[in-house]
């Protein structure tokens, strides 16, 4: 009887130590949040339906002025192209990431990044992209594109990036 309990406890302990497998998606593996891993296939830049084409030719980001979340003329033009591509490629979902520069508090920049992401989301929905295909989140100043304390870096960090995923969120 003791041996049975010992084997059961040993089995449960071993199972608790195992790591879950990777989630396989259409474009490689994804984590528990549906984000593509570093080895995910993004397709060829020459394939107009690929993530690589979207990033290179369509453009995956728009920029903002200091302390602003309203879209300027250049941002709207870039988002018009994104909206058209997303409409023509309905199998993709987008995570819209809002970012801010390092100026200001963490809390303020998280809120500003969220407002920026929401303004992009609302614009894409107004252009015909289904709200069900769009998810917003904010990183505030936590994930800078460039690190330095100059306006050149700040302007690169005040952005929204559209990250594509194939499948469900």
Label each residue range with its predicted role.
Residues 48-49, 81, 149:
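Alpha-helical scaffolding within the catalytic cores
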Residues 99-168:
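Periplasmic OmpA-like peptidoglycan-binding domain that tethers envelope proteins to the cell wall
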Residues 52, 57, 63-97, 121-126, ...:
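Periplasmic peptidoglycan-binding/anchoring modules of Gram-negative envelope and division proteins
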Residues 1-57, 70, 77, 167-169:
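N-terminal targeting leaders that direct proteins to extracytoplasmic destinations
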Residues 33-37, 43, 65-68, 82, ...:
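N-terminal start-of-chain detector that recognizes signal peptides
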Residues 22-23, 73, 105, 145:
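Intrinsically disordered, low-complexity acidic/polar segments
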Residues 46, 67-75, 88, 104, ...:
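Extracytoplasmic/periplasmic, Sec-exported soluble proteins
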Residues 4, 61, 65-67, 74, ...:
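Surface-exposed loop/turn and secondary-structure junction residues enriched for glycine/proline
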